[in-house]
Amino acid sequence: MKVLAVEPPSGELVQGLRSLDDGYIPPVFEKWGGYDLLDGKRIVRPRESIEYARRLADECGIFAGLSAGAALAGAIRVAEQLSDGETATIVFIVSDAGWKYLSTGAWTDDLDEAAANAESIIYF
């Protein structure tokens, strides 16, 4: 088993996520082993987070938030990096809901516009 963190680039915001490099260490992360638990990290930009949150809703009927979109983007990236013939069971956690973002344009604006707005809006 491997455990990978998904986070935005240092200094950027993905709502619901912060870069570990920016100094915020979630208490639950420390409680269960912190950096010793991680086998690696995947960096996900705000645009990808919105894009994959939209895909969760459109393709799977899961109305999740932007951090869940980031988690899906990271999981897909891991799957794409598997060698030919290599198999894996990849699990990601949907940790928030889309209702918090209804008034922000994350679901209705053009993707590029929503991504630009996401970098300057604090959703909650």
Model-identified regions with their sequence ranges:
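Short glycine-rich anion-binding loops that position phosphate/pyrophosphate groups of nucleotides
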Residues: 69, 96-98
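Surface-exposed, flexible loop/turn segments at secondary-structure boundaries
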Residues: 11, 98-99
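Active-site/ligand-binding loops adjacent to catalytic centers
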Residues: 1-66, 105-124
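Ser/Thr-glycine-rich phosphate-binding loops at phosphate-binding pockets of nucleotides
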Residues: 67-71, 90
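Short beta-strand segments
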Residues: 5-7, 91-95
